Curated annotation (Swiss-Prot):
This is Basic helix-loop-helix transcription factor scleraxis. Efficient DNA binding requires dimerization with another bHLH protein. Dimerizes and binds the E-box consensus sequence with E12. Disulfide bonds: none annotated. Residues 1-91, 151-183 are annotated as: Disordered. It comes from the Eukaryota. Keywords: Activator, Developmental protein, DNA-binding, Nucleus, Transcription, Transcription regulation. The lineage of its organism: Eukaryota, Metazoa, Chordata, Craniata, Vertebrata. Plays an early essential role in mesoderm formation, as well as a later role in formation of somite-derived chondrogenic lineages. Residues 73-91 have a biased composition (Basic and acidic residues).
């Protein structure tokens, strides 16, 4: 009876794993090589996708920050535009003031071009000349009030009376005139030339 129950046992491979067949060495090596080749491709594709997303995000950021319809202009261009406009207004006001000042200064010739430095120097000299004219008055017959006394300095307040005219220059000890160099005033020289022309004209008319 014991002999009747014994049966031939199937091979262990077919009994436990009937659908699994062992692989050969060539197939095993081929599967390993294909797996190793697929891994770098997947990594490269992931990197490309990340870089593309970064480029798209950067492009949207740049488009939003520009002064287009979808973005707002930056603060720096607006401040620069305001500063440039303020500087242009200041330059125009200064040029207008210098142009008005040039019209008040007599020059020879009348249409003489003056720089800003020359305009300021001539304006200062003309103010000093007019001050000497007020101080000396008609006492100076040669038309050169600036040569008859010291330069004029307006030290009093507005509306205060003018000081008395200065005395004539003293004589030197050797009996000659004072050896101090005379101040040259272009406006006095211009007046002197005008006086000489008037004398010549009157002399020509009389003769």
């Amino acid at each position: 009876m014991s002999f009747a129950m014994l049966r031939s046992a199937p091979p262990p491979g077919r009994y436990l794993y009937p659908e699994v067949s062992p692989l050969s060495e060539d197939e095993d090596r081929g599967s390993e090589s294909s797996g190793s080749d697929e891994k770098p491709c997947r990594v490269h594709a992931a990197r490309c996708g990340l870089q593309g997303a970064r480029r798209r995000a950067g492009g949207r950021r740049a488009a939003g920050s520009g002064p287009g319809p979808g973005g707002r202009p930056g603060r720096e261009p607006r401040q620069r535009h305001t500063a440039n406009a303020r500087e242009r207004d200041r330059t125009n006001s200064v040029n207008t003031a210098f142009t008005a000042l040039r019209t008040l200064i007599p020059t020879e010739p009348a249409d003489r071009k003056l720089s800003k430095i020359e305009t300021l120097r001539l304006a200062s000299s003309y103010i000093s000349h007019l001050g000497n004219v007020l101080l000396v008055g008609e006492a100076c017959g040669d038309g050169q009030p600036c040569h008859s006394g010291p330069a004029f300095f307006h030290s009093g307040r507005a509306g205060s009376p003018l000081p008395p005219p200065p005395p004539p220059p003293p004589l030197a000890r050797d009996g000659g005139e004072n050896t101090q160099p005379k101040q040259i005033c272009t406006f006095c020289l211009s007046n002197q030339r005008k006086l000489s022309k008037d004398r010549d004209r009157k002399t020509a008319i009389r003769s």
